[in-house]
């Protein structure tokens, strides 16, 4: 049976990790089950989909192969397709070896920007399960698991914010109580921290924490809590930290290919959910070394950040100008609409007033016409009435003992006289006055002055003789 030393060597060769203590810790956590340890290291919480890998070719061709497996990352804040721009700082960072090519082949791109020697590596170390199992079988490291039982996972799944809170709390507990200075790690997921750095136009300082590594206490307490380092990092960076025992910290260590600890990196957002790796620092560093590295990165990146800030400010200014122009346009439009509405309301008011005036004029005209018709009708009725009453009077009788002579004086001074039989009713005298047509009203009374006697409508049934008007009478007309 292959001993633990051989398993450790194969695990380092396949994963690319140089830290023997970390590799031993991972293998121990999986009961020295090599296949399970590699599978846990190279996969997410769900089983990774496999992709075909061309196993032919020699060592010098491994940078030109493109065979990747896209993983499924449930936790928030992890992107499944991100590039990092890598600087080789002469620290001995090496690329994947021959055995690494069997599992995943990162794309290597060399480009220059801001004086930085840059390469690109994808976020995520992904394994094709079938190829991995076959390769380990060929090497003689098949799983020793029996009865289908599974070892416990190395990484427990929790929310990105919860993991960040736990990391900050543990870091403060272990190193913050004895140090007056500490880095302001954000309590949020990696992608949220990346977005924060983008919006604040700062670089993102990443620290991956290996709690059991022998160099971790000295590095955290002596370097990360150094006054000058803390002041510089808090001033110039957004800082995010994660434990490699957490889901997001573990995946970031895979994505950044962290092979030595303590591990720090400086990244910045790039297009299409990608990040640029500007610097990675592996292994213990003194405060002076760390500060020099970070100062150089800030100096080199300053033109880009200043340009981004200026462009963002220009965009905000342009947006504000557009909003002000839109607001002015809307205000002018609303004013025009208000004026148009006022003009329309005034027009409608004038139209209503004109219609009302026309209606009243029409009503007045109709009233005049109606009054004229009624007057004509009344006049015609009076004419007919006079004619009818004149006919009803009959012929004037000749003077005689039973004939009464009546003289009527009208208000205008005109006098009219006629002979009536003494038995004639006073009603006939009224009919006689009406038949003359000299009055415009029917509301009048016949009176005598000496003595004053009113022969009103209540006496119409009396005869002239009974009323004392025989043989002659002089009557006046009094308008009621």
From Swiss-Prot:
Gene3D superfamilies linked: DNA helicase RuvA subunit, C-terminal domain, Glutaredoxin, Phosphatidylinositol 3-kinase Catalytic Subunit, Chain A, domain 1
SMART domains referenced in this protein's UniProt entry, alphabetically: UAS, UBX
InterPro entries: FAF1_2-like_UAS, Thioredoxin-like_sf, UAS, Ubiquitin-like_domsf, UBX_dom, UBX_domain-protein
Disulfide-bond pairs as recorded: none
Region (Disordered): 47-78, 335-383
Coiled coil: 330-389
Entry keyword set: Coiled coil, Ubl conjugation pathway
Protein name (record): Plant UBX domain-containing protein 10
Organism of derivation: Arabidopsis thaliana (Mouse-ear cress)
GN (gene name): PUX10
């Amino acid at each position: 049976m292959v001993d633990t030393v051989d398993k450790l060597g194969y695990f380092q060769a396949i994963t690319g990790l140089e830290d023997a203590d970390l590799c031993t810790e991972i293998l121990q956590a999986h009961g020295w089950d090599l296949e399970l340890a590699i599978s846990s290291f190279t996969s997410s919480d769900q089983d990774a989909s496999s992709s075909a890998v061309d196993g032919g070719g020699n060592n010098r061709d491994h940078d030109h192969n493109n065979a990747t497996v896209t993983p499924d990352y449930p936790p928030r804040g992890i992107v499944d397709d991100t590039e990092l721009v890598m600087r080789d700082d002469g620290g001995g960072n090496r690329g994947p070896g021959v055995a690494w090519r069997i599992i995943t082949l990162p794309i290597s791109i060399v480009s220059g920007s801001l004086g930085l020697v840059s390469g690109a590596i994808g976020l995520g170390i992904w394994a094709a399960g079938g190829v991995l199992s076959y390769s380990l079988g060929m090497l003689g490291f098949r799983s020793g698991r029996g009865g289908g039982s599974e070892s416990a996972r190395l990484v427990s799944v929790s929310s990105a914010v919860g993991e960040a809170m736990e990391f900050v709390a543990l870091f403060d507990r272990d190193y913050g109580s004895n140090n007056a200075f500490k880095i302001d790690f954000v309590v949020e997921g990696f992608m949220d921290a990346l977005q924060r750095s983008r919006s604040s136009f700062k670089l993102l300082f990443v620290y991956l924490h290996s709690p059991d590594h022998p160099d971790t206490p000295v590095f955290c307490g002596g370097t990360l809590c150094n006054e000058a380092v803390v002041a510089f990092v808090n001033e110039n960076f957004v800082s995010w930290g994660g434990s490699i025992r957490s889901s997001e910290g573990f995946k970031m260590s895979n994505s950044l290919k962290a092979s030595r600890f303590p591990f720090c990196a400086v990244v910045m957002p790039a297009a299409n959910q990608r990040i640029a790796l500007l610097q990675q620092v592996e292994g213990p560093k003194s405060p002076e070394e760390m500060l020099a590295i970070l100062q150089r990165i800030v100096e080199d990146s300053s033109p880009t950040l200043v340009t981004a800030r200026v462009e963002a400010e220009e965009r905000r200014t342009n947006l504000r100008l557009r909003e002000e122009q839109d607001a002015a346009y809307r205000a002018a439009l609303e004013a025009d609409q208000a004026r148009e509405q006022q003009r329309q309301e005034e027009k409608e008011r004038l139209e209503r007033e004109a219609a009302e005036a026309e209606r009243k004029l029409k009503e007045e005209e109709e009233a005049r016409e109606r009054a004229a018709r009624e007057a004509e009708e009344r006049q015609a009725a009076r004419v007919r009435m006079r004619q009818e009453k004149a006919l009803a009077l009959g012929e004037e009788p000749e003077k005689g003992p039973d004939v009464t002579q009546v003289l009527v004086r009208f208000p205008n001074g005109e006098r009219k006289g006629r002979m009536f039989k003494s038995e004639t009713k006073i009603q006939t005298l009224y009919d006689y006055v009406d038949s003359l047509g000299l009055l415009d009203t029917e509301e009048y009374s016949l009176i005598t002055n000496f003595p004053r006697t009113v022969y009103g409508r209540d006496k119409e049934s009396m005869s002239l003789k009974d009323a004392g008007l025989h043989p002659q009478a002089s009557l006046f007309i009094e308008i009621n």
